[in-house]
């Protein structure tokens, strides 16, 4: 820190994305545009195992167990999405995550557990989806950045400063020790699908 010759202050009560944009703007002497655009584009993705119809990507995996949402709630949501004409696709990054996705998909006729995927393929699936529902994970932030209607589910952390944020439709549900219910998620999903 002794080599820095400039200091900038940003309001610590602002969302992390806004804080970082303001900090970069101050350091580089510009004012960030009000509209938030992450500038991400994703090439299309198709695979034989992926259904052709409308998709809802369910991002059930996260870095900590206390951020997980109960499988029983995922099953309720996935079944309801099937009734709404969406095919739930459940990816997972490692073996444990793919096993969880497979258990949920096996309990929901018509849901699909994705095979192991790279980030480009996963981003392609997210970009094709009509809706993304995910726990506190970077993939929920990616869905929001891609302007896919996104529901981010929080069970162990407060989303006020680090929840999903974008220019498309998004909603942060739950919070520290406040897991959202399947009913809350489905109510918000209705809003997202009508937006």
PLM region spans:
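Catalytic machinery of carbohydrate-active enzymes
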Residues: 1-195
């Amino acid at each position: 820190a002794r080599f820095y010759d400039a200091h900038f202050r940003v309001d610590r009560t602002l969302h992390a994305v806004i804080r970082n944009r303001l900090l970069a703007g101050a350091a580089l002497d510009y004012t960030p545009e009000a509209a938030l655009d992450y500038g991400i584009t994703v090439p299309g993705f198709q695979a034989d195992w992926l259904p052709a119809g409308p998709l809802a990507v369910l991002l059930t995996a996260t870095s900590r167990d206390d951020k997980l949402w109960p499988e029983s709630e995922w099953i309720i949501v996935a079944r309801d999405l099937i009734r709404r004409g969406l095919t739930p696709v459940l990816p997972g990054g490692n073996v444990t995550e793919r096993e969880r996705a497979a258990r949920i998909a096996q309990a929901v006729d018509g849901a699909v557990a994705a095979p192991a995927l790279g980030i480009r393929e996963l981003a392609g699936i997210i970009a094709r989806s009509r809706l993304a529902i995910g726990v506190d994970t970077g993939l929920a932030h990616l869905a929001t950045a891609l302007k896919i209607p996104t529901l981010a589910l929080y069970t162990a952390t407060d989303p006020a400063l680090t929840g999903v944020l974008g220019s498309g439709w998004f909603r942060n549900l739950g919070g520290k020790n406040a897991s959202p219910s399947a009913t809350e998620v489905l109510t918000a999903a209705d809003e997202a699908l009508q937006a």
